[in-house]
């Protein structure tokens, strides 16, 4: 199921008052330019719910954590930059809401400490592999870290939060899923500058490319198939194909009723025919119940064998082959 995540800041206090009008610090300028009222956040949250998505938010300060509670946010995200902001983390933990954390630029100790903190409080925690380079090049994605996180934190869901260039994002999400990531996060933007035809930020996807990204995820799920903890269910067409390659048992010479079959009496060859025993069922000492001419097939009904008494196996042998 999809979650739509918003970012919440108490902007007037999050940014020092002396820098409110700063134009040369991009992060501050962007934050000031995109400031929203609590009413606007409430409208966003309501729209998310109306579209049957999970409500999720990244609070960047303590007041914003309280806003998450007031807005009925279901899932809280801790940004990579805040993985050791313990004032904020303590406030988030008080909500008892499930948490996802991104690990971009974090030390192993930072991650271990955070995992232990939430484990000790029995608060569900998912851990995202993340590279905090905006935007990231393909060679910077380090998807093998998904393997590392899965091995180190086996009791937690591992995900993938990406900031790569918008073009060609399909392959990395497919690889991430194949490696075991099970939550996926990407920034979304809209082309409000119609003349440029580009997203505001190169690490964001516009709705059209996000659609490709989600479809790539679904294709990865289809390609990877069933869960990896148990043997897959073999489709009938695969079994039928392999049965056509299995060698059947044929008489090497004329054989009499009552003969005990030895390897000198038979040979193996394709095709395997319906009702015929194959190399899989051939056992030395099986007794013939009827005469078999040279080069003729030996069927399951022609021998006294444990296989002949297994009704389920009999049915398989009757139906397989040409």
Language-model-detected regions and their locations in the chain:
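Catalytic cores and adjacent flexible loops of soluble metabolic enzymes
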Residues: 1-322
């Amino acid at each position: 199921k999809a979650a739509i995540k918003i970012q919440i800041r108490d902007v007037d206090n999050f940014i020092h008052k002396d820098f409110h009008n700063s134009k040369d610090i991009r992060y501050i300028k962007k934050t000031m330019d995109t400031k929203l009222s609590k009413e606007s956040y409430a409208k966003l949250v309501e729209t998310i719910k109306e579209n049957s998505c999970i409500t999720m938010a990244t609070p960047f300060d303590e007041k914003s954590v309280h806003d998450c509670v007031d807005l009925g946010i279901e899932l809280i995200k801790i940004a990579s930059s805040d993985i050791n902001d313990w004032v904020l983390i303590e406030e988030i933990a008080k909500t008892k809401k499930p948490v996802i954390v991104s690990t971009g630029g974090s030390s192993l100790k930072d991650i271990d400490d955070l995992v232990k903190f939430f484990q000790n409080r029995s608060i569900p925690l998912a851990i995202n592999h993340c590279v905090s380079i905006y935007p990231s090049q393909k060679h910077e994605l380090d998807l093998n870290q998904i393997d590392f996180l899965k091995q180190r934190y086996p009791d937690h869901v591992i995900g993938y939060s990406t900031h790569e260039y918008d073009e060609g994002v399909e392959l990395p999400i497919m690889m991430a899923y194949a490696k075991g990531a099970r939550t996926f996060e990407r920034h979304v933007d809209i082309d409000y500058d119609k003349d440029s035809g580009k997203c505001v930020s190169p690490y964001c996807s516009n709705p059209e490319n996000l659609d490709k990204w989600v479809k790539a995820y679904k294709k990865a799920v289809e390609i990877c198939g069933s869960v990896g903890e148990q043997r897959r269910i073999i489709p009938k067409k695969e079994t039928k194909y392999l049965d056509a390659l299995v060698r059947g048992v044929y008489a090497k010479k004329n054989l009499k009723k009552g003969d005990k079959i030895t390897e000198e009496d038979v040979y193996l060859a394709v095709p395997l025919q319906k009702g015929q025993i194959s190399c899989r069922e051939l056992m030395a000492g099986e007794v013939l119940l009827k005469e078999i001419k040279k080069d003729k097939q030996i069927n399951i009904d022609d021998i006294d064998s444990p296989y002949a008494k297994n009704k389920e196996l009999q049915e398989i042998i009757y139906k397989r082959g040409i």
